[in-house]
């Protein structure tokens, strides 16, 4: 299936923490193939203290697809910027595959504390800007790079092997906080949000959303699937509240506030999966046309990149593809 002209679609790879060891490689390969078949540009690969290294997962993805681009979550606390640039250039040299980088300022607060990183929230974005600038300069320049900043210093550092210009990585960055939005602007990066309903969002430029989709021919059928996949779960709600209590993430708090506001009305925008600690993004639930209309509203506001939740099956991605095709038809009309 061809890509849409108004939406750039990414899926998400399974997490190793939720999969049996002997099944994980096969599951990553399978989800990657489904994603490519469904017209996705790339696939997000998570990174935190509990997960398999994202670069090794990206290797599995590249080996099992023809053009799907890994969107690798990158945290400064894990690797020097030279190491990230070297990984990107090596993937380009060995596979001729473009990567995308999802620049993460901190992730889970407890992960940072375990690594003795006590950098304040907004300061982590200052660090992330320096970190990303060094990566971009190393990959784009044919000359040695010197950089002196508050957090990093390099002196006449050259990247080899050289990366082809057409393989320079796309840069994504969480844009839910003011610090995140400012960092994205400085880096000319795509600001990704865990969004509120489209009607509650301001216009944006070169932005994206992280969202799940459950769509069927009829609204009732979609909600039946949604309730079966994400039933009420008191234990999950307690885990969510515990995670909230130790998080300094702005998007986490914003989504929790949206959940309080959404309880009083049933709408296409659904947060039970988030509230029961099953996922970290909101969902759109409804008929193909209802979900397409809401996605179109996001796209009209400038949120043209969509990062989907982990797909449970090939069939589910095919349902989502029908939604995206309706959005495309609307743009082409």
Describe the residue ranges of each PLM region.
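N-terminal beta1-alpha1-beta2 module of alpha/beta enzyme domains
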Residues: 1-67, 168-169
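Acidic (Asp/Glu)-rich catalytic clusters
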Residues: 2, 33-37, 58-67, 88, ...
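An alpha-helical appendage that flanks or caps ligand/catalytic pockets
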Residues: 2-3, 115-116, 121-163, 198-297
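Hydrophobic faces of well-ordered beta-strands that scaffold small-molecule active sites
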Residues: 3-12, 43-45, 69-74, 99-103, ...
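Active-site mouth loops of central-metabolism enzymes
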Residues: 6-26, 73-77, 81, 167-176, ...
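Catalytic domains of carbohydrate-active enzymes, especially glycoside hydrolases
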Residues: 27-47, 183-193, 297-304
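Alpha-helix-loop-beta-strand connector modules within alpha/beta enzyme cores
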Residues: 54-72, 127, 131, 321-333
């Amino acid at each position: 299936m061809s890509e849409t002209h108004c939406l750039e679609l990414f899926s998400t790879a399974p997490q190793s923490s939720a999969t049996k060891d002997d099944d994980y490689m096969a599951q990553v390969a399978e989800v990657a193939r489904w994603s490519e078949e469904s017209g996705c540009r790339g696939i997000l690969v998570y990174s935190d203290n509990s997960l398999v290294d994202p670069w090794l997962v990206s290797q599995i993805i590249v080996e099992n697809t023809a053009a799907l681009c890994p969107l690798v979550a990158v945290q400064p606390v894990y690797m020097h910027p030279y190491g990230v640039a070297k990984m990107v250039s090596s993937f380009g040299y060995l596979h001729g595959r473009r990567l995308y980088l999802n620049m993460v300022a901190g992730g889970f607060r407890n992960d940072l504390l375990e690594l003795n990183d006590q950098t304040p929230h907004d300061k982590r974005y200052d660090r992330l800007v320096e970190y990303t600038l060094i990566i971009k300069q190393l990959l784009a320049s044919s000359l040695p790079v010197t950089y002196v900043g508050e957090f990093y210093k390099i002196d006449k550092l050259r990247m080899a092997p050289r990366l082809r210009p057409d393989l320079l990585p796309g840069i994504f960055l969480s844009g839910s906080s003011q610090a995140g939005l400012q960092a994205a602007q400085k880096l000319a990066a795509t600001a990704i949000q865990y969004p509120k309903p489209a009607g509650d969002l301001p216009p944006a430029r070169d932005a994206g959303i992280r969202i799940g989709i459950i769509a069927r021919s009829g609204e009732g059928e979609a909600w039946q699937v949604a309730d079966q996949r994400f039933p009420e779960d008191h234990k999950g709600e307690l885990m969510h509240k515990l995670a909230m209590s130790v998080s300094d993430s702005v998007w986490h708090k914003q989504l929790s506030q949206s959940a309080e506001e959404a309880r009083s009305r049933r709408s296409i925008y659904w947060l039970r999966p988030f509230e029961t600690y099953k996922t970290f993004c909101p969902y759109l639930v409804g008929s193909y046309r209802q979900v397409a209309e809401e996605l179109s509203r996001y796209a009209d506001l400038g949120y043209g990149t969509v990062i989907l939740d982990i797909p449970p099956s090939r069939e589910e991605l095919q349902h989502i593809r029908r939604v995206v095709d309706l959005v495309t038809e609307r743009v082409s009309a």
